[in-house]
Regions:
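Soluble periplasmic/extracytoplasmic beta-strand elements of cell-envelope proteins
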Residues: 38-49, 56, 98, 237-244, ...
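Secretory-pathway/luminal and periplasmic proteins that interact with or process carbohydrate-rich
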Residues: 121-133, 207-210, 303-312
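Surface-exposed patches in mature extracellular/periplasmic domains of secreted proteins
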Residues: 70-71, 101-111, 211-212, 292-299, ...
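Peptidyl-prolyl cis-trans isomerase
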Residues: 278-327, 364-369
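Proteostasis/folding factors centered on peptidyl-prolyl cis-trans isomerases
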Residues: 139-175, 179, 193-266, 298-303, ...
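Short, low-structural-confidence N-terminal segments
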Residues: 1-83, 87, 221-232, 247, ...
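Solvent-exposed, polar/charged alpha-helical surfaces in well-ordered, non-transmembrane soluble domains
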Residues: 51, 55-59, 80-88, 92-97, ...
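N-terminal targeting/tethering segments
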Residues: 27-170
């Protein structure tokens, strides 16, 4: 039992005979109920309460891997987040009203089948998780009951989402209907080839200017998720074969490297490479004979990342301004000057790398190579803008008509 729980129990001891702890609990529950009942928005005859907003926030933030408390701690962001999230609940309410007006709430057998498929897919994933946790709990403590553990995990998981298993299907159904409204609003939004080409040309000009002043700017673009259309010299896509040292050698070499013990590091990596020399020779010999690098990756590679797509065939972007933790990796890449070329063996604390240039990237990315991706990105952006414009119009109209009032300050 941790110290906080012990302290809480000790505080209750003097009150046990008078029922103090239970009274405190009841009082707190009443206070919470009053707080959660605060009305933050009124739309016609529908109230949106603080409790509803908090539940929605916790659901969406959990999917993003963060918490409401974390967001509230960021004072510069909290007010914006509060207003936008409250507005979203209002928009959902208005959109559901629109759905009924348009008949989108009338579901066919096929519609219900799609809803069930999405619901069952999610539940099946949760059930697999619950089975794993329950099994582990029983293996760790045989006195525990598997069915009870399984039920507890399922209940806890759905509680964290703010649903029961039954009410979650209603949520899936609601989102299905709201998606119909969204699709109706954005159905006429398009992007022309001329718009895409104009954006491409503009971005190329801007990026060329940025790279001329600061070539390392390419890495900033990648970090913020901006599409790179112009690459500095030395950039390429690469993939590699890693021949790993045994765990003991790898651990010792990593320690020696971290402690800057150069003589010990040299000894360990030299011995480690010697143990792998037969494999190195075989790979290099077969490459010289014209064998495909990808085939050798499948046979020899100890780096699991490169067993997955797109890394297996396309590799990863790298260049002189990239950040790379593997000692000597950037230097080895810098010596590759043409597509298909393979580096000399690079020895590190992990093992031995043989790196292949998959594609040279320096210069302007051809328009045809990015047209489809840019079109999809621009179309998505225009749809989002159209949705925001229309839904803001709904809210403005409702406020003007006196049927919508929003009170974020009551939170």
């Amino acid at each position: 039992m941790n110290k906080r729980r012990i302290a809480a129990l000790l505080l209750c001891i003097p009150l046990i005979f008078s029922g103090g702890c239970s009274l405190i609990t009841v009082d707190q529950e009443k206070a919470d109920a009053v707080e959660n009942a605060k009305v933050l928005a009124e739309y016609k005859d529908v109230d949106i309460t603080k409790g509803q907003l908090v539940q929605y926030m916790r659901q969406t933030l959990a999917q993003q891997g963060t918490t409401l408390e974390d967001v509230q701690a960021d004072e510069s962001y909290w007010k914006t987040y509060l207003n936008s999230t409250l507005n979203q609940l209002v928009i959902d309410q208005i959109a559901m009203e629109k759905a009924i007006e348009l008949g989108f709430d009338q579901l066919t057998e096929d519609d219900n089948k799609k809803i069930d498929e999405e619901f069952n897919s999610t539940v099946n994933s949760i059930e697999a998780y619950a089975e794993y946790i329950a099994k582990a709990a029983v293996e760790d403590d045989p006195t525990k009951n598997y069915d009870e553990e399984y039920k507890n995990v399922m209940t806890t998981y759905f509680d964290s989402l703010g649903f029961t298993q039954e009410s979650y299907r209603d949520e899936v159904k609601k989102n299905f209907i709201l998606k119909r409204v969204y699709d109706d609003v954005i159905k006429d939004v398009t992007v022309t080839d001329e718009e895409v080409k104009e954006t491409y040309d503009s971005q190329v000009t801007i990026q060329e200017g940025n790279l001329k002043n600061q070539p390392s700017f390419v890495e900033m673009q990648k970090q913020i998720g901006s599409k790179v259309l112009v690459y500095p010299e030395g950039y390429m896509n690469v993939r590699h074969i890693l021949l790993s040292f045994d765990d003991e050698t790898k651990s010792a070499a990593t320690t020696a490297y971290g402690e800057d013990n150069k003589s010990e590091y040299e000894r360990l990596t030299t011995e480690g490479k010697a143990a792998l020399q037969t494999k190195i020779d075989d790979i290099q010999s077969r490459l010289s004979a014209g064998e495909d690098f990808g085939t050798l990756m499948e046979e020899y590679n100890d780096d699991s990342l490169y067993s997955m797509e797109p890394y297996n065939t396309e590799g990863t972007e790298i260049g002189p301004y990239a950040t790379e933790d593997i000692p000597g990796y950037l230097d080895a890449v810098a010596k590759l000057t043409k597509q298909g070329q393979v580096s000399e063996p690079l020895v590190t604390y992990n093992g031995v790398y043989l790196i292949q240039c998959v594609k040279m990237l320096a210069g302007v990315v051809p328009y045809d190579d990015v047209k489809e991706e840019m079109t999809a990105t621009m179309l998505s952006g225009k749809k989002a803008t159209e949705w925001d414009t229309v839904t803001q119009g709904w809210m403005d109209e409702a406020k003007t008509a006196g049927v919508l009032k929003v009170f974020p300050e009551r939170f």
